[in-house]
Amino acid sequence: MKGILGKKVGMTRVFKDDKAIPVTVIKAGPCVVVQKKTVETDGYNAIQIGFEEIPERKANKPLMGHFKKAQVKPLRYLREFRVENVDDYEIGQKIDVTIFSEGEKIDLIGNSKGRGYSGVMKRWNFRGGENTHGSKFHRGLGSTGMATFPSKVFKGKKMPGQYGNERVTIQNSEVVYIDVQNNLIAVKGGVPGARGGLVTIREAVKAKRPKTK
């Protein structure tokens, strides 16, 4: 499975065939292959790639040993991607946006914006209660566990709490255009997270592929 890491730049729009298409621009790569994992040593085939160089003082000793073994500069982010054949990659090899093409379907993984402690109307779209006619119930969640039966709160009950800052995957997004010179990739629609947030881009897992006879 091919993939790359990037950072969300922001949203804009492009025009194709007299249609305005909302796109999110991501600065993707270049990433560096830091480690290769094989079935013999690790039980599966994968490559570990790194993104965004950092000064040595910002990497701890175990990570510095990991980077020195691969003979690469310290990197802020490390992620794994399963591959069929690790021999197609070399330690220190650079991976850029050219692994994707315009019109291709991809999956985007990021952390959604954190919105803090939120009530049920904002977090779960509860309707709420009456605002007039003597009602004292406005934005509350209502009954949580009843009294005699079941006399408990069921697991998974929608209640107030931390909203956002969760791993979100957007599937089957379309690559609208690629700027190889500036390492930019524009995808149709929105991407989870704030500007500057880390985004993992991989080939679509559930993309429709032509049937083979």
From Swiss-Prot:
One of its GO terms (cellular component) is cytosolic large ribosomal subunit. Pfam families: Ribosomal_L3. InterPro entries: Ribosomal_uL3 (IPR000597), Ribosomal_uL3_bac/org-type (IPR019927), Ribosomal_uL3_CS (IPR019926), Transl_B-barrel_sf (IPR009000). PROSITE patterns: RIBOSOMAL_L3. GO terms for molecular function: rRNA binding; structural constituent of ribosome. The keyword Ribosomal protein applies. Keywords: Ribonucleoprotein, Ribosomal protein, RNA-binding, rRNA-binding. GO terms for biological process: translation. PANTHER family: 50S RIBOSOMAL PROTEIN L3, LARGE RIBOSOMAL SUBUNIT PROTEIN UL3C. Belongs to the universal ribosomal protein uL3 family. Part of the 50S ribosomal subunit. Forms a cluster with proteins L14 and L19. NCBIfam families: L3_bact (TIGR03625). One of the primary rRNA binding proteins, it binds directly near the 3'-end of the 23S rRNA, where it nucleates assembly of the 50S subunit. This is Large ribosomal subunit protein uL3.
